[in-house]
């Protein structure tokens, strides 16, 4: 495991390649990604006396699951809500995970080009994430900055599992669902080496057609 010591914004981090990720999946016979969406109000009370309760909880989860999973997903909202302490806990966590597991920043970013560029730098350069979830609804210039970092991945929202997916993603227009248009269009912006999609696990009916 990597030392959880914080590193400087100019640090160069090794990225997990597609080949390495596939190798992990085959060796462990697992697609498991463990979520570290850590809510400090729900962690065991005995950890609240730790100097950094969130990191202490995450460390215990990582130690218990590292041999079973191929990666970890950190929902950044739970860390951002805690201010500086939350960011420190997130950075310590992602460094502790190390380079042998795929690290996803579940941040759902997406803004005008120069803003997305700063988001990409924050998660790919300042912190050593391998991938970040991205909202594509502002168009290509909001997604491209995440695709321009070699060895990094944009995981673009396609069809989500929340009830609100009915408001836009499942609208039927022009002979297809809106999410289908999103998948078709975004697929032209990247390759299988830097682009993935979020498809909600509750959408099993649509999953088979999407995978085709």
Q: What kind of feature is each model-predicted range?
A:
Residues 15-100, 194:
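Conserved N-terminal beta1-alpha1 strand-loop-helix module at the mouth
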Residues 32, 103-105, 154:
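Hydrophobic beta-strand scaffold residues
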Residues 99-108, 192-196:
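Short beta-strand/loop segments at the ligand-binding rim of alpha/beta enzyme cores
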Residues 201-212:
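A C-terminal functional module that forms or caps the active site or interfaces directly
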Residues 77-83, 107-116:
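Conserved PLP phosphate-binding loop immediately N-terminal to the Schiff-base lysine helix
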Residues 45, 111-203:
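Conserved anion-binding
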Residues 1-15:
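Short, basic, low-complexity termini and linkers enriched in Ser/Thr/Gly/Pro
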Residues 57, 61, 89-93, 119, ...:
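A general structural detector for well-ordered alpha-helical segments in enzyme core domains, enriched
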């Amino acid at each position: 495991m990597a030392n959880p010591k914080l590193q400087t914004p100019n640090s160069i981090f090794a990225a997990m390649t597609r080949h390495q990720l596939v190798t992990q999946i085959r060796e462990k016979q697992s697609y498991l990604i463990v979520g570290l969406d850590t809510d400090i109000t729900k962690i065991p009370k005995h950890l609240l006396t730790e100097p950094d309760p969130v990191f202490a909880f995450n460390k215990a989860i990582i130690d218990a699951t590292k041999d079973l999973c191929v990666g970890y997903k950190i929902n950044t909202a739970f860390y951002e809500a805690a201010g500086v302490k939350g960011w420190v806990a997130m950075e310590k966590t992602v460094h502790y995970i190390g380079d042998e597991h795929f690290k996803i920043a579940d941040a759902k970013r997406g803004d005008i080009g120069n803003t997305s560029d700063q988001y990409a730098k924050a998660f790919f350069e300042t912190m050593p994430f391998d991938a970040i979830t991205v909202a594509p609804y502002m168009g290509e210039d909001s997604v491209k900055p995440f695709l321009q970092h070699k060895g990094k991945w944009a995981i673009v929202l396609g069809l989500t599992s929340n009830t609100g997916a009915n408001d836009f993603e499942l609208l039927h227009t022009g002979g297809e669902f809106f999410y289908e248009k999103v998948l078709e269009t975004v697929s032209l912006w990247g390759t299988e080496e830097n682009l993935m999609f979020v498809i909600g696990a509750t959408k099993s009916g649509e999953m088979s057609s999407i995978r085709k």
